[in-house]
Each structure stands twice: as C-alpha cells, then as structure tokens.
C-alpha cells in the first residue's frame, strides 16, 4: 500500500492493522494523521484493532494534546479514540492502562471543558473506578490535583457570579462527576491506594468542604465519607477533620441532614468508632471556633441517648456522661446554648430517659436551665437586645417546663426549692401561658393550698390576689379555680369556713359577669360540694341568695346555665340518696323555672331537657340518657349550638360512698310516685307532677314565644308521651293535649311563636303528627269520638301537608289495625287522596305498603265498591307504567346506587303484589269486569317494549282465577296404573299433559301454568256401555283390553274446526325425550306460591350475649301469645306440603314443630329459636340455631330484656332487617303485670328507609302479630332485592314462566318451516306466549 492509497480514505472502507503498523508514524503530516485517526475512530464501531496498532497510533499522536496545539477538536478526538477502543476491549492490559493514563495525567490543559473530557476518559479507562491496576499509585494525586483546581475556581466566586448560568452549571456538573468517580474508587479499589495518597485525597476533600459553598458540595462530600466508612477506613490523621465536617452538616436544616445522620451512624458502628467518639468529646470540650460543629456534637450525643443505639463502642457512654459532655460547651455561643437547652427538653419529654435521671443529672439540668434563663426577656433592659433568639428561648422554656418532672425533683427541693420557686415567679410575667401554668402546677403538685400545708391560707390568699389583679388569661384563671376546687374536695369541718371566707365569697362578689365555662363551673362545683357535705347555715343562705341573683337578667348566660346545672345536679344527688323532701323542692323549683316565661332562656331550656328525660315503668320513675338532641335540627334547621348542656360535676367531687357520678341517666327509684298533683309529698315518697307537666306542654304549644324551646319540646315530646306507665293516671290532660294538637293540624288554632323564614308550616306538622301518633298507646281509654278524631287528623295531614304525608300514611296504616271501626268509613276518601299523591316518588313505597296491608284485612274491605277497587288498581298500574327505567349500572358496588335501584325494583314488586292480592280479594262474580281495565293498564305500561315477565304472570293469574276460586296449588298426577300413554303439548305459556290409562280407561289432564298446576281426571264411558246393559254377564267373558283412545284424541275435541294458524299451533313435545322429562320434573319442583322465611328470636330479661339469647327455650306468656297470632303451628315431619324454609324434616334437628303463615299468593315460615332444641353441652354457641337465623334476611326480635337491643347482637352477613318488639314498660318481670302495648322499631343494616317501623311505633298486643307479620313480608321482599344487588325482583311465578319459555324456545323451531317469515307482531306473540287479549269477551 503506497502513501497515496493510505491518504485516499474515500477509496478504502477502513484502515487495517497492517496499514497502521507499516505506514503510520509521527512523520506523517499533522492533517493526514488526523484524518487517519478519525477513520480508525469510526472503524472501531465495526472492527477490533490490535493493542499494538492502537498503542502505535497513540504514541504517534501525543502532539495532538501538547500545548503547541490549541485545537480542542483534535484533543477531543484523541480521548474519544481511547474511550472507544477501551470500550471494545474485554480486558485491558496494565501497559495499555498505564500508557493511556500517562496522557490523561500529563495533559497540560486545565480549563473546565478539558478537565471534564479527561475525567470522562479516566472513568472509561478505569471502568468507573472498578479497575486501577497499573495506576494505583498515581490516581489519588491526580484526583487531589483536580479537587484543588476546583477549589481554585471556587475562590474566584466573585468572577463566576458575573458569568452566565450555563458556565456555573458546567462547573457544578464537573464537580459532581469528580465526586462520583472518587466515591466509586473508594468503594471498589481503595485498598490498592497507598495511605499517603489516600490521606492526600481526603485532605483535598476536607479543604473543598471547608472553603467551597456548602450547598454545592455537602451531599457529595457526605457520600464520599459514607463510602470510605462503609467500604474502607478513614485515615487516622484526617479523622478529626472528618468528624468535624459530619457534626457541622448534622445540624443543617437542608435535606442532607438525614444523610449526615446516616453517615454518622455508620461511623460510630465502624472499627474506628472509639477514635470517632474521642474526637466528638474533644469538639465538645475544647473546640470554641466552629459553632456548627459543637452544635452537631451536642445533637449527636442527644441522638445516641434518644435512639438508644446499641453498639459496643458506645456501651461506655452512659446517660450521665452524655449530660456531662453536653454541659461542657455551655456559654460558648448563643446557638450552642440553645441546642443544649433543646437537648434538655427532649430528654425531659422522653419517659425512658426521665426515669433514669439521678441526682447529679438533675443538678446539671437545673444548672443549664438557670444559665439559659439569661436569654429570656425577664426585664426591660438593654442587655436583652443582644440576644437574637429571645422568642425561641421562651418557646423552648415553655416546652421544657411542660415536661419538667417536679415529683422527680422532690429529693432536690431542700437545695433548690427557693431558687426554683423564685425563678418561676420571676419569669411568670413574661413567659407564655403554658409556662405560667407550671407555677400553678407547682402549687398543685406540692399541695400548697391544701389544709395539710402549714402555709395553705397564705398561699390561698396569694392565688386570690392573682385572680383579682387579672394578670392571668382566661385559661390560667380556670386552672387557678381548679386548684381551689381540688382543695375544696379535701376540706373538713374546720377548713371549709376558711375556704369560703378567704376565697370563695370574695370571688363570688365580682363573679356574675364571667362568661366562660372553665372559670364559672369550678365555683358552682364548690358550691355543690359544700352544700351536700357540710351543714353550714351561712353557706346555705348564700347559695339561695346566689340562685335568686343568678337567675335574674343581670347575670351572664354562662352563669345562668351553670346555676341551673347545679340545681339539676343537686336533684341527682338527693335522688341517689333517696331524700324525699329536697327532691320535691328541687322538682318544684325547676318546674317553676320551666313554666315562667320571664326566666332566662338557658335556664328554661335546661329544665325542659331535664323533664323530657323522665320515664316510668309499672312501679317507679327513672331518667333516661338516650335523648337525641339533634333530632329537631334534621327537620326544622335549628342551630344545635342554641341547645345548652348541663355542665358535668368534677370527678374529684364524686364521693363513692354516698354519691354516684352525676350523668343524665338514672335507674328506677320507687321513692318517686306518679301523681296528678304537683304539691303532694310525704316523708317517705315523692310525687311526680305528671298532670302539671302535660299542662305545661299543652300551654307551651299555645303561648310559648321562644321558637327554640317550642320546637325542642314538640320534637322530643313523642318519646315521653308514648310512655304509658308515666301518664296513664293523667288521662284528662292526655285528652286535652290530644284535642289541642288535633286543632293545630286542623288549623283551628295556631302556635304563637314566630316561625323562622326558612321553616315551612308543613315541617312543623311532622312532629305534631308524630306526637298524635304516639297517643295510640292510650287508645283503649279513648271514646269512639276520640278514635274518630284520631283518624280524621291523620287524614287531614294526608290532605293538607305534603311534607308530612309519610307520617300520615303510617298512622293511617296503624289505624287499620288498631281502629278498624273508625277508619272503615274513611277508606274510600283516603284511597282517592292516595291516588292523587302517586306523583310524589318519595311516597311510593309507603302508599303501596299501605295497600298491601289493607288487602290482608278482609273486614275493612268487605264493603268496598267497584270505584274503590278501581282506585286501588289505578294506583298500582300507574306505578307500573311509570316505573324507574333509569337504573344505575348493576355492576356498580356503590351502596347509594344499590339502594336507589333496590327501591325502584321494590316499588315494581309491590305494585304487582297489589294487583295480585286485590284481584284475588274480589268476589268471584266481580272479577270479570276488572280484567279488561287491568289489561289496558298493563298494555300502556308495556307500550313500545316487550312484555315483562311480571306482566305476563299477572295475565296468566287473571286467566286462571277469573272464573275459579280454588286455592293456588301445585297438583301432580294421581295415576296408580303403571301402563299409561302420555303426551305433552306446549300452548302459549302453559304445558298441557294428557295421561291415558291403557287398562282402566281413565284419562288425566294436567295443565301446568306459571300461576299453578291443575289436574282433572276423566273416564270414557262409551266403551263400557254394552256391558252395562247386559243382565247376565258371566266371568268367562272378559272386558276388552287395550288402549281405548290416544291423548291426541282428547285434545282434538278442543281444537278450532276452522283451523289454527301456524304460529298458534300447540307444540307437541317428544314423549321419549329425557330432556323434556327432566324439564317438566324441574318445573314441578318449583313452588307455586311465593315462599319466604324470617327469624324469630326471644330475648330474656337482662340478656345481651348471643349465646344466652339463642339458648332460650322457655319464653314468656306474652311471647307465646304473639307467636300464636303470628302464624299456624305445623308438624315438620308430617306436613310435607308446608314450606319449611330449610328446617330439618327427618330427625327433629330443628325441633318437631314450626310456625308458618299463608295466604293465596304468599307463605312464610318462622325460624323460632325457642322451638329448636338447645344442647349447651355439645353446642354452647347454639350454632345449629344460628345457621337458620344467620341466613334469614329479616329477624323478629321479641325483646323483654329491659335493655336497648343492638343490631349486631347476633351478627350475620345476610341479616338486613331486625324488627325489634319491646314492651312499653321496662320491668315486665319485676312488675308481673300484663303488657298490652309494645314499641316496635326496624333496625337496618344500612340506611334503608322502607318500613313502617323505621321510626318506632306503639302497637297494642291485639294488633301486634298481624302488623309485624305484614311488615316482615315486605322487609323480606326488599331484602331479597337488595341481596341481588338491586336486580329485578324475580317472583316465583316469573321463575316458572321462564322455565316454560326455555322449553318452548327449544322446540319452537321444529314447528315453523325454514322459509316461513314472521312479522314483528307475530314474533312478539310467539315470544310472549300470548296475544294478551281480553279473554273475558269470549268466556
């Protein structure tokens, strides 16, 4: 190869090794060598050159990077060539690495771009610091020189500030890359570097950290030191500087402080940890030049103690030595002192450290606290201006004193008490409230104002002076009163008068304008305590005087409220002590406050709350706690903050020997008797003024001017007046109250209070009607006229007040069961009104449930006219026609969406149920006239849409029972002859089976429909005629045997002689097809009426636990009476036709008997736990009972426990509704009297609002079984819908219809020819199985 071809690069694809070895040397022209090098550089992508060739090239291009050549592009090419070559070599020889390194090391150019290129080349050459063999003695000094060069650039920071941001960024990137390489070198090859060179590099890093800008270098320096600690060892000579840097960065507020903490933790866990701690101690003891380092050392000692680091090297560092070294730099610098004070604070707030402090530790801590107090702004002086952290010191003192354990200081008080107390008193005027409270806590801790202290009177006067000078804020004064209150709780006969004269009475003189609870309440707590514990006539007179003064208009609202609260607490005290005279006096006084409009609102409101909580059982009065204060605000938008609460008495005043804790709730007290008079009382009993209280309620509705009091009374009255035992003796006032509330509804009278603008009058009628509804508990005492008035008032509420319609509907439903005579004549008008309310979607469930319940009361509907029935059918049809088709997605798991969809499906199910029940309740002769009318309504509902299954089964039901009044049943074949010819046809939505006996001539017709199966038996007498008229028929003459007729011959008699259209032909099913036999068998096993189940649980006296409740087998007579009214007893083994709901029929596992109920379309079995066997020994948890109750969607709870029943008492995944029945009187077992009225309430798993008993109702024992059963039926249907995630309700008839449709669709194609085209109308008829025509026109 000649020189020309060597230079003619365009004619050669690459330069080969032989070419380089033969022709390339330093004598070639510079530009030609540059071209060849570029060609080699590019050729390295595809060709691997030998190391000899590359070394020869490298040695002959050294002038490219000499100072004589200032072309940066040439130098860049040289380094790129080297980097590309190295990247192609799997293993680089030591000679090659040394040769390349010499060039990098001796490169004379020092600008930032050249250094970056050299650093990059060095990184490639050493595989990013992983391989330094051959250059291990020289790489350290090179890196040190580069660090020094960077430090030189940092010293010229002023010049760099004038440069653009890009230049600064380039310098910073080089620095980071240099540190990254150095860190890798330390990680992987530091053991090869000699210690002097190692020390040289570390010192350069230290110089960088000490002179460069901290935020630029600290993270990289920390990573470098971390790598050195973890993978190698820090040279001993540089360890002090390293620890100094780590301590300085540890106190930084930047993000790298956590990194510094991690590095320090690694250092103290390394082999040089002992030396590291020596350097930390030296910094604390001797370093007085680097503030940050000293602060960091203090913080490090704190960290070791707080984190309790487990390490052999620091095992000798105890808490005492840590506090000792922390105290060393005290006074060096303000910031250091602040760090030391912060360390003391953190030690004091850590219980594990606080408990380990000894005498000497406390001595040093107090020295620190007292020395650092000079930084606090104690006095107005010029010296305090020198301190920049005054506020911070004050704040940290607040925290220190919060955690200062004075109990631990008790052994030191002899030496430090005077200094400490005077110190706290001095700082009191300028320190924050928390610190000032420490002074009060000191009084509290050492009982300085307790009578047991010899200076307690002097200290008490000192506290009085603090209160009177008003230097304390509100919270401090409240704490001050709390201290005196505690001292009052341990007072005796001698100290009580002194306490009153020296503190209590002087405070009271200037007390009436106080407005904060925490200041006022302790005074009343002391008044209460002294009143009930000491017979001090002067104090008693003072209390009476104060009550008269505080109830007046000159006192603040807080004073009035707490004065009334004290009066109530006094009543509770005497109630618990059963002291009749003061009980009667306080009752009379509070009733006077309540009845007097001129008394303050807050006092009257508290008394109203007090009286509304009273309840009675058969023999005594008790006070309940569960009164919902927020109930008025849900309907009437009253601000809850307007309702005052009784301030609770301090726990320190509860004398367990004589007084229970004063909360609202109180158990029975037979000391208080029920009376109609408010003035009668005796030595051993108290009469409760029920008549006076009722009189106030009625008068309040007429004359009360305060809206809040009036509404609170109206909205909470229902719970109290439903307590029959309490007011049964005041019937005259009950009658008056009923008359007045009826007048309000009829708008004969009006309330006098000014109604707020945001409250509608209809909203007020809701609680009024609820109150009238609760008077059902007295209806057995009402006259016929009063019962009629009750029905009329609810009907008026239905007509006049839209917002109260749901209350009126529920009340009218109760009237159907409780007052049938009074409501019977009103029912037609009620139905007309309900038909006008169907446009209100929120009333749909209530209206339809009302109609369903009404249909099950035959005595009420016996005189219904055609117009009444049409109203009912019209309501149901309207709901079907306007059902909600805009359901949420069925895949949605949102509870709110599921509830919304469930309501929609429930309304549709109720509407069809109304059609079915009411149609079957018609007299047989009247049914025909309503069929066309109902069909028109159903067609309107399905216009433009396919007929629903529920619509089709309604049609089928009317077809089957329009002319028949037989029971809906599932009859089966009764043939006993095994030789039978059978054929089955599908016609429309029915199966028509003909069974012909071959031998006897009997013929059986079985018609299977969605709404029932009917069986008829026939006999062909024609074949027997000739034998019947023979006089002498001998035995030798046998009857003709064989098939007399086929099933088809019987069916032919019912065919149209004019022919049947193709789509209307009966479909003959294959008689020998197993799938047909299986389908018919499955169909026959589907029940013909809706079968539901519900749990029935008896809860005995004081029972709470599930196991105890389920184990009951001996219920009360009232429960048995209720059970007998609920259903009919049947035997599980013998009554196979009755739906058992999963109960065992073979082995009496679930008992021998059960209760069920059935009407024409529905049956329900009750899983009664008391009728199931109980075996505590083998089944202590009664799981055999729980397997039924736990799977019932609805459970009836007959609760005679005397306790509130919780929904989760018997937890179950599938139990959605609990209908809880509770006797109106609490103590049934103790009174032994007949319980006639019950509270019934539906508890739901979710916020489901569908039931009559969503809010509890009062029901008599006579009506209880029927109304509970009807609500249980509805709840079971709704629960089925909800359990299906709001899917459509599948009625049992609809399920039978679907089975028929599947069978018809399977064989339909065999009847129609392949080329037969059906129009849409015909397809619809085939799909529906009927033309939905009016069959009464030809029957």
Swiss-Prot record:
Query: PROSITE patterns per the record?
Result: RAPGAP (PS50085)
Q: Which SUPFAM superfamilies match?
A: Rap/Ran-GAP (SSF111347)
State its location(s).
Cytoplasm; Nucleus
A cellular component term, taken from the record's GO annotations: nucleus
**One Pfam family, short name please?**
Tuberin
Q: What is the top-level taxon of the source organism? A: Eukaryota
Q: What is the effect of changing residue 1191 to K?
A: Decreased arginine uptake
GO MF entry, a single one: GTPase activator activity
Q: Where on the chain is Phosphoserine found, per UniProt?
A: 1036
Q: Which UniProt keywords apply?
A: Cytoplasm, GTPase activation, Nucleus, Phosphoprotein
Please provide the Gene Ontology terms (biological process) for this protein.
negative regulation of G1/S transition of mitotic cell cycle; negative regulation of TOR signaling; negative regulation of TORC1 signaling; positive regulation of autophagy; positive regulation of L-arginine import across plasma membrane; positive regulation of L-leucine import across plasma membrane; regulation of small GTPase mediated signal transduction
Q: In what residue span(s) does the Rap-GAP domain sit? A: 1109-1303
Its biological purpose is as follows: Together with tsc1, required for uptake of various amino acids from the environment and for proper conjugation. Involved in induction of gene expression of permeases and genes required for meiosis upon nitrogen starvation. May act as a GTPase-activating protein (GAP) for the small GTPase rhb1.
Listed PANTHER family: TUBERIN
Q: How does it assemble?
A: Interacts with tsc1.
Name of the protein this chain belongs to = Tuberous sclerosis 2 protein homolog
Q: Which organism is it from?
A: Schizosaccharomyces pombe (strain 972 / ATCC 24843) (Fission yeast)
Gene symbol here is: tsc2
């Amino acid at each position: 190869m000649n020189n020309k071809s060597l230079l003619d690069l365009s004619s050669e694809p690459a330069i080969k090794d032989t070419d380089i070895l033969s022709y390339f040397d330093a004598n070639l022209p510079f530009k030609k060598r540059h071209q060849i090098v570029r060609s080699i550089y590019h050729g390295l992508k595809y060709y691997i050159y030998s190391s000899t060739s590359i070394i020869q090239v490298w040695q002959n291009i050294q002038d490219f990077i000499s100072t004589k050549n200032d072309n940066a592009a040439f130098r860049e090419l040289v380094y790129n060539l080297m980097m590309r070559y190295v990247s192609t070599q799997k293993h680089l020889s030591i000679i090659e690495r040394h040769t390349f390194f010499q060039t990098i090391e001796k490169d004379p150019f020092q600008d930032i771009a050249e250094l970056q290129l050299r650093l990059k080349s060095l990184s490639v050459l050493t595989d990013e610091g992983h391989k330094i063999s051959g250059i291990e003695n020289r790489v350290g000094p090179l890196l040190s020189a580069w660090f020094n060069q960077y430090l030189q650039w940092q010293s010229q920071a002023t010049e760099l500030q004038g440069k653009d941001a890009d230049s600064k960024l380039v310098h910073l990137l080089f620095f980071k890359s240099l540190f990254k390489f150095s860190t890798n070198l330390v990680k992987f090859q530091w053991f090869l570097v000699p210690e002097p060179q190692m020390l040289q590099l570390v010192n350069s890093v230290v110089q960088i950290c000490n002179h460069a800008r901290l935020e630029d270098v600290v993270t990289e320096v920390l990573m470098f030191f971390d790598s050195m600690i973890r993978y190698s060892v820090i040279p001993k000579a540089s360890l002090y500087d390293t620890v100094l840097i780590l301590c300085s960065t540890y106190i930084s507020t930047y993000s790298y402080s956590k990194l510094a903490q991690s590095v320090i933790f690694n250092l103290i866990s390394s082999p040089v940890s002992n030396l590291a701690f020596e350097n930390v101690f030296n910094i604390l003891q001797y370093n007085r030049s680097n503030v940050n380092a000293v602060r960091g050392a203090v913080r490090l000692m704190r960290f070791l103690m707080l984190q309790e680091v487990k390490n052999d090297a620091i095992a000798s560092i105890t808490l005492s030595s840590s506090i000792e070294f922390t105290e060393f730099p005290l006074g060096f610098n303000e910031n250091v002192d602040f760090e030391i004070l912060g360390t003391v604070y953190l030690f004091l707030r850590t219980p594990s450290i606080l408990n380990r402090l000894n005498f000497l530790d406390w001595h040093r801590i107090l020295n620190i606290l007292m020395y650092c107090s000079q930084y606090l702004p104690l006095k107005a002086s010029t010296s305090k201006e020198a301190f920049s952290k005054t506020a911070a010191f004050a704040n940290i003192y607040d925290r220190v004193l919060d955690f200062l354990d004075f109990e631990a200081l008790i052994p030191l008080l002899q030496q430090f008490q005077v200094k400490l107390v005077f110190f706290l008193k001095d700082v009191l005027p300028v320190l924050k409230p928390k610190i000032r409270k420490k002074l009060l806590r000191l009084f509290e801790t050492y009982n300085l104002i307790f009578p047991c202290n010899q200076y307690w009177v002097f200290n008490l006067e000192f506290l009085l002076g603090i209160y009177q000078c008003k230097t304390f804020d509100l919270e401090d004064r409240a704490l001050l009163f709390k201290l005196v209150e505690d001292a009052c709780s341990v007072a005796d006969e001698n100290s009580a008068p002194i306490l009153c004269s020296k503190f209590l009475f002087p405070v009271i003189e200037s007390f009436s304008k106080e407005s904060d609870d925490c200041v006022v309440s302790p005074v009343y707590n002391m008044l209460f305590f002294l009143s009930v514990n000491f017979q001090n006539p002067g104090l008693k007179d003072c209390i009476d005087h104060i009550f008269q003064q505080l109830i007046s208009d000159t006192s603040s609202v807080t004073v009035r409220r707490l004065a009334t609260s004290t009066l109530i607490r006094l009543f509770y005290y005497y109630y618990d002590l059963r002291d009749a005279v003061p009980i009667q006096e306080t009752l009379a006084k509070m009733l006077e406050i309540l009845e007097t409009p001129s008394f303050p609102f807050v006092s009257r409101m508290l008394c109203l709350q007090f009286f509304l909580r009273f309840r009675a059982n058969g023999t005594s009065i008790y006070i309940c706690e569960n009164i919902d204060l927020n109930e008025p605000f849900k309907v009437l938008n009253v601000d809850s903050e307007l309702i005052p609460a009784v301030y609770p008495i301090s726990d320190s005043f509860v004398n367990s020997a004589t007084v229970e804790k004063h909360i609202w709730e109180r158990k029975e007290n037979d000391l208080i008797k029920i009376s109609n008079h408010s003035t009668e009382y005796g030595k051993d009993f108290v009469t409760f003024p029920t008549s006076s209280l009722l009189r106030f309620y009625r008068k309040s509705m007429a004359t009360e001017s305060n809206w809040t009091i009036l509404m609170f009374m109206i909205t909470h009255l229902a719970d109290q007046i439903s307590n029959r035992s309490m007011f049964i003796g005041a019937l005259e006032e009950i009658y008056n109250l009923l008359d007045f509330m009826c007048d309000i509804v009829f708008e004969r009278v009006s309330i006098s209070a000014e109604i707020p603008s945001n409250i509608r009058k209809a909203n007020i009628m809701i609680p009024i009607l609820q109150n009238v509804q609760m008077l059902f508990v007295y209806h057995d005492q009402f006259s016929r006229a009063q019962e009629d008035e009750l029905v009329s008032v609810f009907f008026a509420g239905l007509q006049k007040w839209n917002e109260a319609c749901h209350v009126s509907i529920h009340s009218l439903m109760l009237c159907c069961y409780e007052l049938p005579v009074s409501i019977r004549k009103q029912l037609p008008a009620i139905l007309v009104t309900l038909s006008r309310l169907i446009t209100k979607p929120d009333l749909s469930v209530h209206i339809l449930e009302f109609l369903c319940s009404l249909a099950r009361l035959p005595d009420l509907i016996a005189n219904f006219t055609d117009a009444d029935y049409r109203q009912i059918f019209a309501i149901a049809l309207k709901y079907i026609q306007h059902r909600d088709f805009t359901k949420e997605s069925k895949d949605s798991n949102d509870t709110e969406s599921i509830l919304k969809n469930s309501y929609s499906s429930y309304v549709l199910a109720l509407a069809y149920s109304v059609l079915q029940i009411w149609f079957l309740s018609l007299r047989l002769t009247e049914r025909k006239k309503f069929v066309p009318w109902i069909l028109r309504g159903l067609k309107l509902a399905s216009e433009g849409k396919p007929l629903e299954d529920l619509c089709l089964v309604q049609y089928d039901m009317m077809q089957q029972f329009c002319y028949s009044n037989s029971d809906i049943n599932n009859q089966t074949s009764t043939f006993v002859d095994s030789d039978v010819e059978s054929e089955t046809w599908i016609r429309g939505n029915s199966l028509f089976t003909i069974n012909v006996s071959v031998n006897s001539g009997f013929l059986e017709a079985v018609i299977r429909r969605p709404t029932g199966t009917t069986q008829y038996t026939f006999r062909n007498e024609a074949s027997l005629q000739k034998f019947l008229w023979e006089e002498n028929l001998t035995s030798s003459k046998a009857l003709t045997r064989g098939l007399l007729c086929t099933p088809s011959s019987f069916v032919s008699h019912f065919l149209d002689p004019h022919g049947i259209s193709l789509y209307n032909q009966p479909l003959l099913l294959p008689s020998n097809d197993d799938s047909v036999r299986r389908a018919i068998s499955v169909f026959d096993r589907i029940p013909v009426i809706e079968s539901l189940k519900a749990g029935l649980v008896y809860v005995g006296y004081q029972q709470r636990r599930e196991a105890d409740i389920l184990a009951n087998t001996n219920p009360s007579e009232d429960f048995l009476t209720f059970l007998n009214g609920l259903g009919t007893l049947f035997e599980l083994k013998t009554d196979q036709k009755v739906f058992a709901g999963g109960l065992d029929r073979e082995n009496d596992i679930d008992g021998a008997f059960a209760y069920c109920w059935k009407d024409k379309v529905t049956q329900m079995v009750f899983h009664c736990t008391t009728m199931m066997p109980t075996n505590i020994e083998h089944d202590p948890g009664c799981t055999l009972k729980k397997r039924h109750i736990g799977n019932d969607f609805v459970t009836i709870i007959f609760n005679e426990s005397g306790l509130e029943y919780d929904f989760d008492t018997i937890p179950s995944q599938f139990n959605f509704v609990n209908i809880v029945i509770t006797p109106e009187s609490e103590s049934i077992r103790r009174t032994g009297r007949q319980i006639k009225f019950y509270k019934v309430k539906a508890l739901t798993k979710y916020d489901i609002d569908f039931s009559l008993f969503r809010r509890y109702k009062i029901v008599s024992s006579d009506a209880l079984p029927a109304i509970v059963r009807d609500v249980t039926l509805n709840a079971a249907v709704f629960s089925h819908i909800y359990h299906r995630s709001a899917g459509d309700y599948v009625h049992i008839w609809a399920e039978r219809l679907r089975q028929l449709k599947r069978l018809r669709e399977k064989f339909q194609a065999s009847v129609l020819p392949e080329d037969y085209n059906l129009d849409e109308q015909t397809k619809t008829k085939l799909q529906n199985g009927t033309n939905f025509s009016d069959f009464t026109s030809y029957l």
